[in-house]
Regions:
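S-adenosyl-L-methionine
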Residues: 1-166, 172-176, 240-241, 246-260
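Short, glycine/acidic-enriched loop or turn micro-motifs at the edges of active sites
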Residues: 73-75, 98, 127-129, 186-188, ...
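Acceptor-substrate binding/catalytic loop of class I
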Residues: 99, 158-163, 210-219
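Conserved acidic-Pro-Pro-aromatic motif
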Residues: 89-93, 170-260
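Conserved Rossmann-like nucleotide-binding pocket used by diverse enzymes
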Residues: 69, 92, 123, 164, ...
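Conserved phosphate-coordination/catalytic loops
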Residues: 48-52, 159-166, 188
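Short N-terminal helix/helix-N-cap motif within the alpha/beta-hydrolase-1
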Residues: 77-80, 102, 132, 191-195
Length: 260
């Protein structure tokens, strides 16, 4: 651990545990100055959450009228990032875990003046292969890794939580706007999400930011890659993404028709 990182962690911990501060301003990065919950991953506040190269490429995709689906929105990082550019479009943020939803709502309230056109819509359910009720793990020690995939290697003994879920294709049929970009970070359920978006992928060909989780479900990465290649997508592995857990990989996926 470098000295700066140590000092930043120490500063956050003192403010959280000694001074009982629930929120601090983010130190650096694209969300510098945003107020953020101190109980979340400290990398958010340090401005080091997610890979810089990935963020740059995603920002190049975003336009003022983009429709952005944030699947596995957690506490809102990518939704806030997209909102910096999307002025006339819409951001659907999907997050089923109540604790994350509560923090996301507090971030919306605390950063209200920074949010352009109030276009972030928080959807409190999961996205999967079909409309159904799924049972999530609800482990507070695994706040960013809870999943409904029964075979997950990380599904530790914990409380369970029933949540509603729906597919992307069903959502569009029921009035949700067609996505231009879909971010998928759903802890091993990414293949289910793709299965529930077959029509959308074939007809509308949205761009994808896909996180695969072999750490949850061994082989899920190759399964998703093969699925998308059959659908005509070209994938780019983000080599510079610094993942702390083996089996986590990020991909940018664009349909071949959009490259010509």
């Amino acid at each position: 651990m470098d000295i700066l990182n140590f000092i930043q962690n120490y500063y956050i911990k003192i403010n959280r545990y000694i001074f009982n501060r629930k929120f601090l301003k983010i130190f650096a990065g694209p969300l510098k100055g945003y107020k953020w919950n101190t109980s979340t991953n400290y990398d958010y506040i340090k401005g080091k959450y997610e890979d810089g190269e990935t963020q740059i490429e995603i920002k190049e995709w975003l336009k003022h009228d983009t429709v952005f689906y944030d699947l596995g929105a957690n506490v809102g990082y990518y939704s806030f990032l997209a909102n910096q550019i999307i002025t006339n479009g819409i951001i659907y943020a999907f997050e089923p875990i109540p604790e994350n939803v509560a923090i996301f709502k507090s971030h919306l309230k605390l950063n209200d003046k920074r949010i352009l056109n109030k276009n972030i819509h928080l959807c409190q359910f999961a996205v999967s292969a079909k409309e159904q009720t799924v049972v999530f793990s609800n482990n507070r020690n695994l706040a960013e890794g809870n999943t409904y995939i029964k075979s997950s290697l990380h599904k530790l003994p914990s409380d369970s939580l029933e949540v509603k879920s729906n597919s992307i294709d069903n959502l569009i049929e029921n009035g949700y706007r067609i996505p231009d970009i879909i971010k998928i970070d759903v802890e091993g359920a990414e293949y289910d999400v793709l299965l529930g978006a077959i029509k959308t992928l074939e007809i509308h060909k949205p761009k994808l930011l896909l996180a695969t989780h072999d750490c949850h479900v061994p082989g899920i990465k190759d399964k998703c890659i093969q699925f998308l290649k059959v659908k005509g997508y070209i994938l780019k592995h983000m080599d510079s993404s610094a993942k702390l857990i083996g089996g986590l990989d990020d991909y940018l996926a664009v349909h071949a028709n959009q490259l010509t």
